Amino acid sequence: MFKFALALTLCLAGSLSLAQHNPHWWGNRNTIVHLFEWKWSDIAEECESFLGPRGFAGVQVSPVNENIISAGRPWWERYQPISYKLTTRSGNEEEFGDMVRRCNEVGVRIYVDVLLNHMSGDFDGVAIGTAGTEAEPSKKSFPGVPFSAQDFPPSCEITDWNNRFQVQQCELVGLKDLDQSSDWVRSKLIEFLDHLIELGVAGFRVDAAKHMASEDLEYIYRSLSDLNTDHGFPHNARPFIFQEVIDHGHETVSRDEYKDLGAVTEFRFSEEIGNAFRGNNALRWLQSWGTGWGFLPSGQALTFVDNHDNQRDAGAVLNYKSPRQYKMATAFHLAYPYGISRVMSSFAFDDHDTPPPQDAQERIISPEFDEDGACVNGWICEHRWRQIYAMVGFKNAVRDTEMAEWWDNGDSQISFCRGNKGFLAVNNNQYDLSQELNTCLPAGEYCDVISGSLINGSCTGKSVTVKDNGYGYIHIGVDDFDGMMALHVDAKV
């Protein structure tokens, strides 16, 4: 009997782990966009007018629960919670619920950035939150939950990042570290997440996961409710979990401790793709991209060119400020068959603390668009760049196909096919790419979705004629606006 019970427990644990890697996408959709700091009402409209029609699979939204109000309203105040009331600068609970419903109705899932590791950092005196709740972080007093000093371990500072105790028990940049082994703390975190599940979300991005013991997170995840079938999820569907674990390869707390609980953010993907497209590595080395580079298995890796944190850091990571290289890197990211893909949608920043676009009363303003649909009032909206949303469509068109017919020039001109459904060529050299290449596509004329769009049977950009043998003439000039070309079966003229 004991052996049967043990086997059943192990079986259930394994099935739960696999379930938490399922993002619950509609149809062939398979790209998440992070609409960083957007208001809920604007996200709802964006789902209906742009994301749904363009085939995006889901949205990662900023933290939804009440946070401290910081002077100047820097973006990071959202990561300093003081209660689990659903009121932030992005909107209130009613607006959040309306957004989730409307996005689900057009096939766009919602994933919430959740803060389970900590509460707000120190604040002089009594802090006021975005829902009007008072707290005294310096005394570890958060009556809006309520949490008190007994719900936190003794305060200490992380001075040694190779010390597991410090990494998981001390305060990350001064933020009050919760005790996730406490029954009370666990119950409040589970209650918060279950409320979001009830409202229709598909899953969670778990902030600062490496600063929590994996066994505590496993308990919390296992205790969550199934997804809400009223929002189109099947019975017994588990929330998709992806966890922020920064692991450069030799960390005391490893990504491998979390990968079976859900997907894990693959930060080395971001760093290495930046290195390659900045010219520090030849693109020919990308043929073995993914696990060949020591990355996590594809189904366990949440992949991205940049995120809201590392786009603000110096180093190899690309961001919107290097648009030509950024678009090439994103095209490769979305074309190569590896990982669970997320693209960034930023606002403009001049320094690390720049707040989102706001009015004189420090209220977040809605994005505005020009005649081409690009954002113009402080929002960058990379997801609305044609070269990026076109590659979201490419990724949908080639889903479940393998990479084939890799070609390179021995340096930084590359091409490859996705089965017989798609083809990507990239030129990151300082001279033209002019070559007959195997596109693997059926014979015909194809619109390059990077330089233009297929509208009413006509291509507004470059086109390529594919011969009966699958070959076509590919030209990407060194002075072309974009350094890549993408063809797929849904863009056949």
Swiss-Prot record:
Pyrrolidone carboxylic acid PTM positions: 20
Active site (UniProt): 207 (nucleophile), 244 (proton donor)
Leading EC class: hydrolase
Names of required cofactors: Ca(2+); chloride
Keyword Secreted: yes
InterPro entries documented for this protein: A-amylase/branching_C, A-amylase_C, Alpha_amylase, Glyco_hydro_13_cat_dom, Glyco_hydro_b, Glycoside_hydrolase_SF
Gene Ontology MF: a single term: alpha-amylase activity
GO BP term, example: carbohydrate metabolic process
Signal peptide: 1-19
Name recorded for this polypeptide: Alpha-amylase-related protein
Species in which this protein is naturally found: Drosophila elegans (Fruit fly)
